[in-house]
């Protein structure tokens, strides 16, 4: 045993081989620093300052969305930027808290029951370390491509449900009330119910009740004006400063605090090492949210990263970026941060500001971190209603009419998946909505892929293909069946049923299956085809298989189907001569039938045949 362990390296040798096979670079920033010069530094400093001016107030807003102290959003923004720069292979993705992950945190806290601020903060490290491990392990196993199974329709439904929850959940911070510890606001429905109940208890006859609403309305007006006139400025930060000044003037004029809650400044000891607790029951409750949050991080980050990389003619290493997100979340788990994902707005701003390398993220992170310790004490001067309305504006910005139109008007399947995800996100916890949406999209896809439609075609006197009317064959015939699409387990029974239906004609003697466009044959489809062969032999009919590609042939060989069909009745595809395999099959069919006078019918997928005709018509009109 000792020799065996020594020979193969044991667990450490296996891990070393796995990391080599992952093709990850565990310190990619060294490639940037080797030829770093002054011109790149100037570009990175400019971009870094611009991103920091946006990331700082957004970090506060995302902390409020999640129901955490503001320092979690600020430290999360800073350390995600710094760690992301160290492990990212490109400059395109700027990491930090986002709307999607903040709402996921809020939803996770809600499912855990009544929690104080300290209890929520205690859960974050355990949750983030699970998210980070999920992303790191996924990157090592090169699983970034698996994200394609979460469709953009699911993400759109989730984002819009999250936007609604964000806006409704900020009503309490705007008006000035809190839910009791016994209230469980798990979903949008719960938040609406509790909010309406609390609004009914407010003393609307007193003018102080209306003051925070008026202050919030004026704050929104200032922001919209700044956005219209000075869109290039850091308007979120400027608006919060303006709101704080307005409230300060109002308190001086009225000589009272006006009963408005203020934000709390980051605590002096807010930055500390948080050691996650690994309790089995807590991990069981958090695992679903951790996986969903990990999927969201990769989806958000890779979406904006691939877009920005394509604009510059570059290619994004998805697994490397997934690894950087994982390391950022692991770092934030012990450094009082929030979940780190790829930010759409900050990534776009970084690119438009002319960032030369990922060093711009390092500069942004250091500026945010410095801002916490220099101007962090002044955060307590910002009224909660001002930040609440800015969060509402951010939530409203998530609605996209274009995306809504695309996912609801393009296909019925997309519309169903969108509404299922959206409504589930309103009624249940948001992480559950992602799983339901993914499940619905996969089920609808399988239904489409598992529903082949075979239509009989024949040649007219002019030599044109046309659909044949239902009739009895009068001569011995050969039927050529074009097998196209997926031959996985979901399609096997339907294919067998439809094939047996036309094989029931006693005048039919030979069926030729053309397998060139068949894909992903599995054990279930092999057993279905085996059943078809035995059924036809009992009816003294023959089945030939042609244009069999190497992967399909390998499956047939391993399953024993190749021997059952027989070497004389199976013809491999010849890539250099596409028609040779089918010609051999027709020649073999003539030998079986024993005459050259026979009527040949062809079966194809009606939808694909129609699509092919449409493409040919388009070519002929050009």
Which residues make up each language-model segment?
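Cytosolic C-terminal regulatory domains/tails of membrane transporters and channels
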Residues: 1-28, 453-622
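Transmembrane helical cores of multi-pass ion-transport proteins
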Residues: 2-460, 475, 560
């Amino acid at each position: 045993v000792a020799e065996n362990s020594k020979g193969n390296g044991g667990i450490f040798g296996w891990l070393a081989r796995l990391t080599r096979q992952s093709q990850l670079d565990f310190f990619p920033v060294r490639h940037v620093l080797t030829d770093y010069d002054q011109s790149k530094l100037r570009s990175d400093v400019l971009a870094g300052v611009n991103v920091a001016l946006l990331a700082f107030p957004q970090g506060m807003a995302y902390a409020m969305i999640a129901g955490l102290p503001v320092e979690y959003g600020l430290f999360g923004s800073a350390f995600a930027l710094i760690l992301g720069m160290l492990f990212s292979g490109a400059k395109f993705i700027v990491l930090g808290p986002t709307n999607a992950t903040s709402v996921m945190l809020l939803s996770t806290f809600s499912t855990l029951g009544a929690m104080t601020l300290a209890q929520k903060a205690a859960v974050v490290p355990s949750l983030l370390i699970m998210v980070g491990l999920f992303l790191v392990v996924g990157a090592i196993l090169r699983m970034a491509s698996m994200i394609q199974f979460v469709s953009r329709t699911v993400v759109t439904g989730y984002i819009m449900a999250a936007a609604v929850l964000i806006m409704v959940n900020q009503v309490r911070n705007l008006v000035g009330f809190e839910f009791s510890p016994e209230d469980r606001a798990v979903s949008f429905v719960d938040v609406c119910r509790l909010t309406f109940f609390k609004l009914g208890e407010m003393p609307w006859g007193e003018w102080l009740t209306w003051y925070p609403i008026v202050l919030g309305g004026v704050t929104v007006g200032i922001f919209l004006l700044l956005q219209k006139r000075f869109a290039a400025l850091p308007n979120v930060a400027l608006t919060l400063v303006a709101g704080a000044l307005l409230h300060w003037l109002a308190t001086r004029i009225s000589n009272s605090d006006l009963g408005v809650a203020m934000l709390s400044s980051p605590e002096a000891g807010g930055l500390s090492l948080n050691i996650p607790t690994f309790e089995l029951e807590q991990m069981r409750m958090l695992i679903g949210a951790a996986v969903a949050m990990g999927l969201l991080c990769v989806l958000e980050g890779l979406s904006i990263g691939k877009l920005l990389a394509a604009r510059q003619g570059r290619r994004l290493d998805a697994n490397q970026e997934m690894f950087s997100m994982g390391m950022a979340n692991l770092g934030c788990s012990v450094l009082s941060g929030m979940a780190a994902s790829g930010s759409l707005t900050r990534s776009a701003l970084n690119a438009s500001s002319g960032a030369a390398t990922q060093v711009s993220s390092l500069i942004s992170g250091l500026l945010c971190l410095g801002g916490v310790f220099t101007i962090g004490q002044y955060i307590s001067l910002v009224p909660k209603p001002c930040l609440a309305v800015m969060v509402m504006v951010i939530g409203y910005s998530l609605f996209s009419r274009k995306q809504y139109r695309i996912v609801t008007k393009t296909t019925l399947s997309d519309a169903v998946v969108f509404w299922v995800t959206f409504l589930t996100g309103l009624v249940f916890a948001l992480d559950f909505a992602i799983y339901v949406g993914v499940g619905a999209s996969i089920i609808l896809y399988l239904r489409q892929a598992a529903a082949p439609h075979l239509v009989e075609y024949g040649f007219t006197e002019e030599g044109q293909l046309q659909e044949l009317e239902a009739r009895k064959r009068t001569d011995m015939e050969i039927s050529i069946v074009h097998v196209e699409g997926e031959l996985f387990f979901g399609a096997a029974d339907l294919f067998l049923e439809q094939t047996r239906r036309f094989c029931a004609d006693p005048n039919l003697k030979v069926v030729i299956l053309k397998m060139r466009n068949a894909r992903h044959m599995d054990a279930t489809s092999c057993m279905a085809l085996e059943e078809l062969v035995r059924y036809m032999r009992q009816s003294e009919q023959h089945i030939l298989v042609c244009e069999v590609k190497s992967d399909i042939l390998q499956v047939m060989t391993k399953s024993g189907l190749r021997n059952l069909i027989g070497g004389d009745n199976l013809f491999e595809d010849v890539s250099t001569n596409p028609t040779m395999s089918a010609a051999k099959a027709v020649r073999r069919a003539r030998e079986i039938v024993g005459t050259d006078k026979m009527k040949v019918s062809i079966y194809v997928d009606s939808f694909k045949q129609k699509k092919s005709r449409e493409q040919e018509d388009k070519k002929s009109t050009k």
